[in-house]
């Protein structure tokens, strides 16, 4: 068992990583006998894990209710969020309840925002079941729903009380979803940890094959990096913005193509290559490093080109709604070397368009 702490003073919390955690009620602390909890999951995961997690909690004396939502990025919306609020109010659940987010990034983001909003804030546990949510979205307190004009535009910073990562969940994850998660894994190596990038170049196939030691190390290292960044910059005023490598381009793909048609990690992968080409055009990232990034993404089963249905010009309106835009100026996360990156403003739109064109299949 691995345990990492996200250090945020009184709001610090543990990330627990191991196989078989769903069988142990201690995994779901601080829930205890007599507590009330609302389990939030989706229609795909409910048959796989709901009875197990609910049973463990109820046998521990926790009073559990549940809400089962439709599955997919297109349902990360205010309309579906209202279903969670309705379930909480119907029972009813008070300010002493705990929301348990059992699912991937969509469930975690949506349930977390519900926790941040319901009666002005109730505690919640993240129980991520996808690689992407285990290495990224469950850690750090970003919660949100989408708007038709932009991804994650309505949300809050709201930290969980615990993150429970059961490695066994990945055995049921479709290969495409696993690859999607690997985009965020590779991102950490590009932006902050050259040694981890080198390790991934040697071990990416072992991770895709779910070999235990490689998988456990991979998830642990990602969580260590994310925890350190969040502890240093919880509200994304500086360093935390680096975690958005590829996302400014990628969110444009998701919004333009329709949420769910491109998985988040697929869009981020193409976006990271676009960012690499932008950095190359600025003279701060070598041709050989661009090729290394592309090669690793391909080996991870990810796209390195944007959708053929989009023109470079179709990206810009979405990119200008990015949360890093300040005073109307586009700001991009760009690599400066493998393991190093920066947030850079003032990049000419013509250069951005040319970099996107570099990645059109």
From Swiss-Prot:
<keyword id="KW-0520">NAD</keyword>
<feature type="binding site">
    <location>
        <begin position="105"/>
        <end position="109"/>
    </location>
    <ligand>
        <name>NAD(+)</name>
    </ligand>
</feature>
<feature type="binding site">
    <location>
        <position position="142"/>
    </location>
    <ligand>
        <name>NAD(+)</name>
    </ligand>
</feature>
<dbReference type="GO" id="GO:0046872">
    <property type="term" value="F:metal ion binding"/>
</dbReference>
<dbReference type="InterPro" id="IPR030963">
    <property type="entry name" value="DHQ_synth_fam"/>
</dbReference>
<dbReference type="Pfam" id="PF01761">
    <property type="entry name" value="DHQ_synthase"/>
</dbReference>
<feature type="binding site">
    <location>
        <begin position="71"/>
        <end position="76"/>
    </location>
    <ligand>
        <name>NAD(+)</name>
    </ligand>
</feature>
<keyword id="KW-0170">Cobalt</keyword>
<protein>
    <recommendedName>
        <fullName>3-dehydroquinate synthase</fullName>
        <ecNumber>4.2.3.4</ecNumber>
    </recommendedName>
</protein>
<dbReference type="GO" id="GO:0000166">
    <property type="term" value="F:nucleotide binding"/>
</dbReference>
<dbReference type="InterPro" id="IPR050071">
    <property type="entry name" value="Dehydroquinate_synthase"/>
</dbReference>
<keyword id="KW-0057">Aromatic amino acid biosynthesis</keyword>
<dbReference type="GO" id="GO:0008652">
    <property type="term" value="P:amino acid biosynthetic process"/>
</dbReference>
<feature type="binding site">
    <location>
        <position position="247"/>
    </location>
    <ligand>
        <name>Zn(2+)</name>
    </ligand>
</feature>
<dbReference type="GO" id="GO:0003856">
    <property type="term" value="F:3-dehydroquinate synthase activity"/>
</dbReference>
<keyword id="KW-0963">Cytoplasm</keyword>
<keyword id="KW-0479">Metal-binding</keyword>
<comment type="similarity">
    <text>Belongs to the sugar phosphate cyclases superfamily. Dehydroquinate synthase family.</text>
</comment>
<dbReference type="InterPro" id="IPR016037">
    <property type="entry name" value="DHQ_synth_AroB"/>
</dbReference>
<keyword id="KW-0456">Lyase</keyword>
<dbReference type="InterPro" id="IPR030960">
    <property type="entry name" value="DHQS/DOIS_N"/>
</dbReference>
<dbReference type="GO" id="GO:0005737">
    <property type="term" value="C:cytoplasm"/>
</dbReference>
<dbReference type="GO" id="GO:0009073">
    <property type="term" value="P:aromatic amino acid family biosynthetic process"/>
</dbReference>
<feature type="binding site">
    <location>
        <begin position="129"/>
        <end position="130"/>
    </location>
    <ligand>
        <name>NAD(+)</name>
    </ligand>
</feature>
<dbReference type="InterPro" id="IPR056179">
    <property type="entry name" value="DHQS_C"/>
</dbReference>
<comment type="function">
    <text>Catalyzes the conversion of 3-deoxy-D-arabino-heptulosonate 7-phosphate (DAHP) to dehydroquinate (DHQ).</text>
</comment>
<feature type="binding site">
    <location>
        <position position="184"/>
    </location>
    <ligand>
        <name>Zn(2+)</name>
    </ligand>
</feature>
<comment type="pathway">
    <text>Metabolic intermediate biosynthesis; chorismate biosynthesis; chorismate from D-erythrose 4-phosphate and phosphoenolpyruvate: step 2/7.</text>
</comment>
<keyword id="KW-0547">Nucleotide-binding</keyword>
<feature type="binding site">
    <location>
        <position position="264"/>
    </location>
    <ligand>
        <name>Zn(2+)</name>
    </ligand>
</feature>
<dbReference type="GO" id="GO:0009423">
    <property type="term" value="P:chorismate biosynthetic process"/>
</dbReference>
<dbReference type="Pfam" id="PF24621">
    <property type="entry name" value="DHQS_C"/>
</dbReference>
<keyword id="KW-0862">Zinc</keyword>
<keyword id="KW-0028">Amino-acid biosynthesis</keyword>
<feature type="binding site">
    <location>
        <position position="151"/>
    </location>
    <ligand>
        <name>NAD(+)</name>
    </ligand>
</feature>
